[in-house]
Amino acid sequence: MDPSSDYHFLNQILWRRVKLTLVSGIFEGVLQHVDPNKIVVLKNVRNAESGRSVPGVKVFFGHEILNVELMDEAEGASGEKASAVSINTERAGMEKVKNEDVNVCEPASPAPEVPTSSLLSDLKYCPSEEEEVTYTVIDQFQQKFGAAMLHIKKQSVLSVAAEGANVCRHGKLCWLQVATNSRVYLFDIFLLGSRAFNNGLQMILEDKRILKVIHDCRWLSDCLSHQYGIMLNNVFDTQVADVLQFSMETGGFLPNCISTLQESLIRHLKVAPRYLFFLEERQKRIQENPEIWLTRPLPPSLLKILALETTYLLPLRLVLLDEVMSDLTTLVDGYLNTYREGSADRLAGTEPACMELPAELLQLQDFQKQRRERAVKEYRVNARGLLIRTPLHPKEPTACTAGKEERVQGFLFYKTDGGDQVPRFLCPKSHEDEKFLDKESKQTTAKSQIVPPRKEGEAHKDSKNKPGCWESAGPEDPRAQKAHALPPTWASQSQFSLKEEIEQLTVVGNKGALTSPKEGALVSPSLLQETWEAPTDTFHLPEKAEVSTLPPCPALEKTDSWISPSLNLF
């Protein structure tokens, strides 16, 4: 194959289907790229002799090609117009890939070169879809390893990830993924061994001029340090940046937990959960077989997971940087307009050397105060003073499990995996409340008829062993212990229907009993939570509650001594 004559001819038939006759066989595919250095790239490759398709893109070298034939298929012609604009992009992206027998996965429809963040934000993974990420597997030192090192050393920012069997000083590192703006390299450390680090990777990982973007660098840093003597340097950890961003957003509060990569991509990159299926698939595979990354050869589906896992880190870093630096941008904008849009008289009396903190920068105090006030309203605080983050993926509600939603007098109690309750108001209606109370009273009556009377000492023991769907106060809670030790007279009082008691009390109220001056007032969430944790199925309100349009119930007041009198409404 003479480059001087055939190069221009092949460029004229780009995106047409061709047949290449090689020394070792015959291959068919769509001509995607022709390099002056005798490199021909085909996609949708099929071995004409065996009939088997080759996944991704196949690279052929000029000294192997004996003949090139143009195949008359509409497939190539239809793709020519749509992809002609990407010829220069592909040529720049390959960057003279010498001596690389690259077996990679390429986007189905190449597009003009655009900023990496927007290009990567559209990535998605589904086993039934075509590959949408380019990656190169490096499992030998000949040809591919040297070219990869040359490309990586030219970068200023990289994303790095690792997979293996319990990646730490006691585990086994199997794969090291390194992604740039245009390439993703999958280094098979299981096959290459420590020579991979000695021949260039160690220099890159320790280089203080190259920024490495990693999500949770603790495990990889421990593994590299103790097994290979590598001190990881200049790292941007997206997990740490997520906590810093949360602290700034809430005025100084810290979250109760860190975020996984999937949560960070959903929260900051706004990636739809269905496009992050590959992370769920990864977790599923690891649970089924913790040593899945030791498999050789690794299935293409897992190789795609490795590539995608690393590719998303670069745009995630850019978004986190923008969010963390948002206050700086706002304050600088105010600084720019301080004198420019002010009166000229103000400048005459201003000393240039005045070092007093200007009002434009004092706004930062107001920002933090407002954020703290908003955070206290939006989040709940745990015992350590940390804000409890709302799960991004609540599990499907099941009976007697976390994630169950229950409506209680106009409130929606959402129970998280951690056992916390978040009350949310749902605009109560009187007829809905009446139906709810009627339903609860029927359940109470049915239970009281079936359950035989028990001794006083057995109440706490049985309630401890009885499974329940909602949270209990626990044996350490003195309120729960006292509630379980109620006298036996309570059982006889609970025999009455709650609806009948309310109707009787309504009649008494119409004759002169006091009613609440605040009709339609809302019940305090803390009060409802205390009432919800009662061991019985009947709701009670303390005497100070000014929320019900019904008069107080004398029969219920006698047994409300266990409710803390300090509970007040708004």
From Swiss-Prot:
Keyword Nucleus in annotation: no
Main location: cytoplasm
Keywords, comma-separated and alphabetical: Cytoplasm, Meiosis, RNA-binding, RNA-mediated gene silencing
Location in the cell: Cytoplasm
InterPro entries (UniProt xref): 3'-5'_exonuclease_dom, piRNA_biogenesis_EXD1, RNaseH-like_sf, RNaseH_sf
Effect of inactivating the gene: Mice are viable and display normal fertility but show defective biogenesis of antisense piRNAs and activation of transposons. Reduced sequences generated by Piwil2 slicing, impaired biogenesis of Piwil4 piRNAs and derepressed LINE1 retrotransposons.
GO molecular function: protein homodimerization activity; RNA binding
Renumbered residue ranges of the record's region Disordered: 433-485
Xref: SUPFAM superfamilies: Ribonuclease H-like
One GO CC annotation: PET complex
Gene Ontology biological process terms from the UniProt entry: meiotic cell cycle; piRNA processing; regulatory ncRNA-mediated gene silencing
Quaternary organization: Homodimer. Component of the PET complex, at least composed of EXD1, PIWIL2, TDRD12 and piRNAs.
Domain notes: The 3'-5' exonuclease domain lacks the conserved Asp-Glu-Asp-Asp (DEDD) residues that coordinates divalent ions essential for exonuclease activity.
PANTHER family xrefs: PIRNA BIOGENESIS PROTEIN EXD1
Family: Belongs to the EXD1 family.
Function comment: RNA-binding component of the PET complex, a multiprotein complex required for the processing of piRNAs during spermatogenesis. The piRNA metabolic process mediates the repression of transposable elements during meiosis by forming complexes composed of piRNAs and Piwi proteins and governs the methylation and subsequent repression of transposable elements, preventing their mobilization, which is essential for the germline integrity. The PET complex is required during the secondary piRNAs metabolic process for the PIWIL2 slicing-triggered loading of PIWIL4 piRNAs.
UniProt-recorded name of the protein: piRNA biogenesis protein EXD1
UniProt organism field: Mus musculus (Mouse)
UniProt lineage: Eukaryota, Metazoa, Chordata, Craniata, Vertebrata
Gene behind this protein: Exd1
